[in-house]
């Protein structure tokens, strides 16, 4: 579109931002797009991302399917990057705190350096955030991060309750 080389841009940012960790969002087996890619393509993209300046790769799958995260997690660990595994927060009869805690434990066992609650729709309510963070903190040893949106106007209070519950980032 702009005729730019994204790796050049990343290296330029890294040259000017020396003491700050750079993070990218990575859609698991879909990399940055909306279709699946072969394992070797995922591995090479992770390698190039870290080699060009990315420190933290936040990897997620919209379906919370760990199978779609394994290659990216393994590749990030191989390249000595920090792999933050995110789960997509939603609400339903099966998407409860026990479900998310089990998922977080599985991500930790797969090699996650940190876990992110990815509240991409802004659905997480303040007291639900408190309970979820407490459950996660008792289930995993790695740091927990909250990423939320202001869609429902609750983000500041949700963040406050998550802090009170001990969220790390």
What function would you assign to each model-found segment?
Residues 2-21, 31-146, 152-153, 157-169:
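Alpha/beta enzyme core
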